[in-house]
Each structure stands twice: as C-alpha cells, then as structure tokens.
Amino acid sequence: IDPGHPVYPHVEGFQSIVLLKNDESSRPDTNDWHKDLTFKSNPPFASILHGVSVPKIGGDTLWASMSAVYDSLTDGWKEDLEGLEAIHDMGTFRNDFYKEGGINSVNSALKKVGSAVHKVIEKHPISGKKYLNVNQSFTRNILNVSQGASDHILQFLFQLLARPEFQVRFHWQNNSVAIWDNRITQHYAVNDYLPNSRHMQRVTIINDKRVK
C-alpha cells in the first residue's frame, strides 16, 4: 500500500488512507482526467475508493479505458508515439504548497516529491494490451521534441478521452466501493454536487503480485 499522499490529508491514525472530503469550504479539485500519482517513478497499479457519505444527486466518477483510446489511434499516430517518453510532475498540487509558503515551499516540494519519466505508450503486464500513458493532471511535456510539438501532441491525446465510447460512469451510494487498475484507466470526479458534501476514503496499491 502506498504510504501516503504529499498533499491530501489522511484518516487519523492511518497514514495510507487518504481523506477526500469536499464541500463549499473545501472545494473539489479532481474534476479533470487523471491517473493517481504518476509523478512517482512507481505509480500505484490499483486504487480503492470508498464512498463514506455521498450526495444523493451528483458526484459520479467516470473512468476511461486507455487501451480503447490507444486502439482508436491511426497507425501513423501509433508509430509516431511508440518509444516516446514524457515527464510527469505534481501539477497543480503546486498551488497547495504555494499557499503554505510561497515559491520556496513550491521548490522544496518539487525536490521532495520529485518527478518521473514514463513511456507515452505502455504495455499492460498482464493482458498485454497497449495503452496511452499520459494524463492532464501530471504529464508536463514529451521529451526530445519541441515545447510546441509536445503541447500539440498532448492536447490532441487529452481530448480523445471526451468520447463517451471510452467511458463508464458510476453513481455512488453510501458505502459503495470501487476498485480499478490505475495503469490502464483514467478517472474523473464530477464536480456537480455543491453545496452538498462528498466524503471519500482512498488507498492506492503499489505492487501487483502477479507481475514477476
């Protein structure tokens, strides 16, 4: 189990259980497409999310299949993306550190939390399916291409996730639990429930014991 999150609070006495509690005083910030913690060199392979107390209407979570997104690409795009790598960092979590202590706090956090390099196209170690491995929240730029080319490529890839054909949507009830493969999916928490509150707890699992 991942030992904790660099920004989000945890359940008292349980460092590895992340507390995601949002309302008007603590507005949600997960309403964009992302994979959990890809700024780490070894991101979690799975996430488990528990709906402790959820709104009756709204607050759904969407998941997108990144293998389906990859399969939708033309052969030309697949060839061009194969072998490329991208830098992932903590993204807008910078805002939290800036509020705490200005730019010095941001710089310290960047050094402490670190960045990671991941392949743009990965192969799932169990299914063998290829999947797209970039996300809006944490993928900063593609290595060894110009900034303009990197921006163009990433924006093209990000907008593909908007297609409903690649998505599934889950409506939470109190004590619902969702488990997903963090490698081959991305998710989006819909921010449509304020002023109601949404109380979730999450753990992330680092190692897949099926992978030798």
Report each predicted region and the residues it spans.
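Non-heme Fe(II) oxygenase catalytic core, chiefly the N-lobe of the double-stranded beta-helix
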Residues: 1-177, 182-212
